[in-house]
Amino acid sequence: MTKTDPAPMAPPPRGEEEEEEEEDEPVPEAPSPTQERRQKPVVHPSAPAPLPKDYAFTFFDPNDPACQEILFDPKTTIPELFAIVRQWVPQVQHKIDVIGNEILRRGCHVNDRDGLTDMTLLHYACKAGAHGVGDPAAAVRLSQQLLALGADVTLRSRWTNMNALHYAAYFDVPDLVRVLLKGARPRVVNSTCSDFNHGSALHIAASNLCLGAAKCLLEHGANPALRNRKGQVPAEVVPDPMDMSLDKAEAALVAKELRTLLEEAVPLSCTLPKVTLPNYDNVPGNLMLSALGLRLGDRVLLDGQKTGTLRFCGTTEFASGQWVGVELDEPEGKNDGSVGGVRYFICPPKQGLFASVSKVSKAVDAPPSSVTSTPRTPRMDFSRVTGKGRREHKGKKKSPSSPSLGSLQQREGAKAEVGDQVLVAGQKQGIVRFYGKTDFAPGYWYGIELDQPTGKHDGSVFGVRYFTCAPRHGVFAPASRIQRIGGSTDPPGDSVGAKKVHQVTMTQPKRTFTTVRTPKDIASENSISRLLFCCWFPWMLRAEMQS
């Protein structure tokens, strides 16, 4: 296998903010483990990560015996070990201290850089403290060892212009923040990063809702009144809950606490605008609903994607402003009507969702009033809605060439009937054979007989039969995963049962909308993309070279 030289991906030149340092000298190979550590740092050329012969995985696993032989083999070079560290997988990041120690044993200078990402071993250690992928304890052990050997906290990656403290704040690792600031110079805590609008580490923590890192930075003297290039202090870059998507109501609790923490930390001599958006806390919820033509119990559409029943409107403890609580038709929510221990309404688990008032509109396809008059959706009267389905079907027969707008919306809201041809997950075609509740999962499910044997069963799950089809032709999917692509394929005699199931469906099809980017997204897109490049590109490059 020939090694690919990613020369076109060379890091850009240093910015003005980078500390003065001696010129790095590229070296072709790492020194042997017995060689003394060099006096000057160098930039190591990029290399692919070594893997055992006939290895089943595309990433390096330090827990595997074959990989351990490579890791502890003196012939494994420093560039190859840097390539292993670049792999953003838990198996590698949890062993950052072991791999880092092997790099140092081979004579690596404590401030040597990886030629592909321009990151030092201390940068990698701070990144490895990320919760979920990394291990903060292992990252702290390696960082303490590097700092004891004289690692420079002020060095920056030329890709992201971030130093070690910026990485620790970005990945919300307060233990690393304490270690880095313990012996660092005072000006390090307020050092700025050009890719985050020349904001400090406190700005980075605030904009990414890193509450733990923000508290630690304030404890160590971070300036809460320092302004970035846009004239914003850290409290002003905290994401506003009103701009968050529908599934981030819980994150609003963190945003509120973080903004309060930063505002209270600002000296009294510094004046800050306490309100950046209109405050509707004193507006009664019923007046807000009346202005929108809504009332509790109405069928609503959230952000053009999810349908449900309006259960609450008013102020909340987790964020300022007016919020609406909706009981969704499908278990696609985040709660049961309570957030942070405060109950606002009652609904089944995973069917409650909070959203700003601006993201709610009245659903066109409203069900009978009996469905919205009680907190919990009761079982529907099939005999009555079946007749309604027949009337709609007859109306379409009278004028098939020009159906009314109402009938089209009814068909769209119904998704599909038994016997309809559908597309599952945008990939598999089949015919609807079942719709209703199941024993294997809550909510309503479609049972589809696929055209090809790419399914999971023959219409039965865990011994319960819902429909009949050939083996491996059956699959179940929620309404959000199917798309109607044709009419019914069943004989006319089966249409009555189809209408009955047709009217039970109450979900709107999901539509694709262009996400509105907030100023925070636009301001930080360069830094985020570069950071993701440093994490993922080396692994992608390795996979491409193997293929």
UniProtKB/Swiss-Prot annotation:
SUPFAM superfamilies: Ankyrin repeat, Cap-Gly domain
Cellular localisation: Cell membrane; Cytoplasm; Golgi apparatus, Golgi stack
Designated name of the protein: CAP-Gly domain-containing linker protein 3
Any single GO BP term: positive regulation of protein localization to plasma membrane
Organism: Mus musculus (Mouse)
Pfam families per record: Ank_2, CAP_GLY
Ranges of Acidic residues composition bias in the record: 16-27
Membrane topology: Lipid-anchor
Biased composition (Low complexity): 367-377
Domain of life: Eukaryota
Gene3D superfamilies assigned to the protein according to its UniProt record, in alphabetical order: Ankyrin repeat-containing domain (1.25.40.20), CAP Gly-rich-like domain (2.30.30.190)
Domain comment quoted from the record: Microtubule association is inhibited by the ANK repeats and the Golgi localization region (GoLD).
Keywords for this protein: ANK repeat, Cell membrane, Cytoplasm, Golgi apparatus, Lipoprotein, Membrane, Palmitate, Phosphoprotein, Repeat
Miscellaneous comment: The N-terminal half is dispensable for proper Golgi targeting, whereas the GoLD region is required.
Known role: Functions as a cytoplasmic linker protein. Involved in TGN-endosome dynamics. May modulate the cellular compartmentalization of AKT kinase family and promote its cell membrane localization, thereby playing a role in glucose transport in adipocytes.
Residues that bear Phosphothreonine: 374
